[in-house]
Regions:
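Specific transmembrane alpha-helical segments of multi-pass solute transporters/efflux pumps
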Residues: 1-2, 6-7, 35-84, 121
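Juxtamembrane C-cap of transmembrane helices in multi-pass membrane transport proteins
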Residues: 2-17, 29, 65-75, 83, ...
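Small-residue-rich packing faces within the transmembrane alpha-helices of Major Facilitator Superfamily
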Residues: 4, 24, 28-32, 116, ...
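Juxtamembrane helix-entry segments on the extracytoplasmic side of multipass membrane proteins
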Residues: 16-20, 24, 45-51, 124-145
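Transmembrane alpha-helical segments that form core, pore/gating elements
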Residues: 31-34, 91-93, 129-168
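Hydrophobic transmembrane alpha-helices of multi-pass small-molecule transport proteins
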Residues: 34, 54, 86, 93-94, ...
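Cytoplasmic-side transmembrane-helix entry/capping segments in multi-pass membrane proteins
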Residues: 48-58, 103-116, 135-139, 161-168
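Residue-level hotspots within the lipid-embedded alpha helices of multi-pass solute transporters
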Residues: 57-61, 85, 139-147
């Protein structure tokens, strides 16, 4: 419920803030909250670990949210909600390509199609769909960024730190 409402609330806030300002406020609140929950500073062992954290921060924290917020400037929140729901599909494809141990089965494709159709009908509820190519394409790029982030996050999680430490 909260996840789905972010598109609408972000769209409203973008009337008063730029995408960068909105992200700054959002991440500042998140960072301060995480500092309270986990005040200990994470010490990384080597440069390779730092690269994984930089990639996760760049793809999943900055680029995904920046592109998504920018897309909301050009298209409807409903479009973003529906289009971004394809991120798990991109994630599965990328995980299969990067980690051959991740199975890619036909039941996933069928389940994805059924879920996407359900999300589409719930989101549009009989209303006409309004396409906005610039915003809709940016949303697809955001979904791809989330897929890259998800694959990078698998590597970050293998470093053995807690989720709060990884997020902070």
């Amino acid at each position: 419920m909260f996840w789905g409402s972010t598109f609408v609330s972000s769209k409203i806030l973008l009337d008063s803030f730029t995408p960068i300002e909105l992200l700054f406020i959002r991440f500042l609140i998140g960072f301060l909250t995480l500092c309270i929950l986990s005040p200990k500073i994470l010490k990384l062992e080597n440069r390779k670990d730092e690269i994984w954290y930089i990639l996760s921060g760049l793809t999943g924290v900055f680029l995904y949210y920046f592109i998504e917020s920018t897309a909301l400037v050009y298209t409807y929140a409903t479009n973003v909600g529906v289009i971004i729901s394809i991120a798990p599909f991109f994630t599965s494809i990328l995980a299969y390509l990067c980690f051959k141990d991740e199975p890619f089965k036909m039941n996933f494709v069928v389940g994805f199609i059924v879920a996407f159709i359900g999300i589409f009908f719930i989101s549009f509820n009989g209303q006409q769909m309004h396409l906005s190519p610039k915003g809709d394409i940016l949303t697809i790029v955001a979904a791809i960024m989330w897929a890259i982030y998800s694959v990078v996050l698998k590597k970050v999680n293998e470093l053995g730190h807690t989720s709060i430490q990884n997020t902070k």
